[in-house]
């Protein structure tokens, strides 16, 4: 079973499905890292006194959160590198984010474990408190994160379906007919999936 980093979910699965294998989806680990990186960026922006540096820090949010391998535009890559060179904690956090994603690209579970252990060590050495706290969460869920190598499952499709349902709920806001909502749900999924 694939889940996020919620203690309630992992506890419920362990309690009610004791024989089920539990995998923490890599999307959720990456999302947590992106949230911490953005929070750090905002903290650094508030602490920065130089107005020009503040503008640079504020203007690179989407570049920080984007997959580094997907930044092909020279101007964007240059802008990111310039911003990172101005702020060491932000640079460290950014490269830790990129390193974290490599856990799921390893050829074996053992290599992924070694990389994850090294990542946690680097985070602790960085002394960036937001990330140190996250590292303790990663350490607590390490078994479930690495379980991906045994089961290779993700909850991406379910997350996508949930997102489509949320969008549909916003689109038909004000309709009071539950039967109509149910029909729209079936029509929404009829094209791609059979429920």
Regions found by a protein language model. Give the residues of each.
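Acidic/histidine-rich catalytic cores and adjacent linkers
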Residues: 2-19, 23, 27-31, 49-195
């Amino acid at each position: 079973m694939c889940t996020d980093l919620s203690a309630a979910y992992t506890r419920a699965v362990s309690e009610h499905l004791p024989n089920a294998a539990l995998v923490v989806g890599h999307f959720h680990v990456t999302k947590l890292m992106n949230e911490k990186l953005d929070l750090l960026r905002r903290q650094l922006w508030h602490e920065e006194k130089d107005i020009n540096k503040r503008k640079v820090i504020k203007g690179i949010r989407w570049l920080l959160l984007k997959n580094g391998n997907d930044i092909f535009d020279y101007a964007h890559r240059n802008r990111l590198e310039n911003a990172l060179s101005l702020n060491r904690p932000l640079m460290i956090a950014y490269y830790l984010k990129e390193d974290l994603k490599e856990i799921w690209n390893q050829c074996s579970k053992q290599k992924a474990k070694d990389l994850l252990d090294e990542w946690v060590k680097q985070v602790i050495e960085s002394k960036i408190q937001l990330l140190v706290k996250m590292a303790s969460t990663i350490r607590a869920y390490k078994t479930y994160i690495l379980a991906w190598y045994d089961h290779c499952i993700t909850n991406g499709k379910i997350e996508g379906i949930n997102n489509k349902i949320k969008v549909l709920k916003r689109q038909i806001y004000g309709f009071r007919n539950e039967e109509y909502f149910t029909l729209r749900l079936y029509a929404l999924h009829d094209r791609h999936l059979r429920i």
